[in-house]
Amino acid sequence: SHKMAELAPRDVVARCIFKEMQQDKADHIWLDATQVEGVEKMFPMIADTCKEYGIDISKEMIPIAPAAHYMMGGVRTDADGHTNIDGLYAVGETACTGLQGANRLASNSLLEGRTALAIRQDSEHLPLDLGQQWKNDGLRPAQDDDTDLQTQRLQQIMSTYLGIRRDKEGMTQALKEIDKLARHYDGCSATQYPMLDLRARITVAGLVTRSALEREESRGAHYRSDFPETKDEWKRHSIISKATATTL
């Protein structure tokens, strides 16, 4: 138990929920909000979603389980969303501005959203043809019909091996499977969004896994059962490059 109970940091609460689910061999635990006066007005979207499944959150407990929620990290940018590519901006969860650390603080995304709006208003004059044209010359046709299946497979890999609890053995296995997916689609033409999206997901998954393997400690949402303690030498951001696939 934690001294702050349900007000403990999100990573702590998620690990506690995960532990209970494992002990009970269950796919969820129960959240009791029936004693919270006006809970439907406080959380209208949750209340409406639960109603669709026949649950009245003012009278019944809610089945819950940890899930991916917010990206802490992303494309390296400055405070104004500039990347190292001319004309390419990254904002919100796509970007790593330095605002987020190893844990997500409530409402920080609102600050990033306000900044993104200001950037958008200031960048309307920028030309749209700064980037290079995508070339399919010499590439073999891609089989786009399996992108949904492979996307689900990638999600399963990341959830299993890089979810709430991580270790070297699991992440090494994840990297093998991610690299296998990457080789499968290497050299394929990709003109449709589902294929472009899948290839980008594979790239990001590989970079996240390599970075997590390199960080031999636990900090915030990055929890390693083989390195459960926080280490001062890792009190910094990790920057990983696709070109080198090594952390800097």
Where are these regions (language model features)?
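FAD/FMN-dependent oxidoreductases across multiple families
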Residues: 46-89
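Glycine- and aromatic-enriched mobile tails/lids
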Residues: 2-6, 17-20, 70, 76-90, ...
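Long, contiguous hydrophobic alpha-helical segments, chiefly transmembrane helices and signal peptides
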Residues: 29, 62-64, 94, 220
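An anion/pyrophosphate-binding glycine-rich loop and adjacent beta-alpha core
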Residues: 1-62, 118-124, 132, 144-151
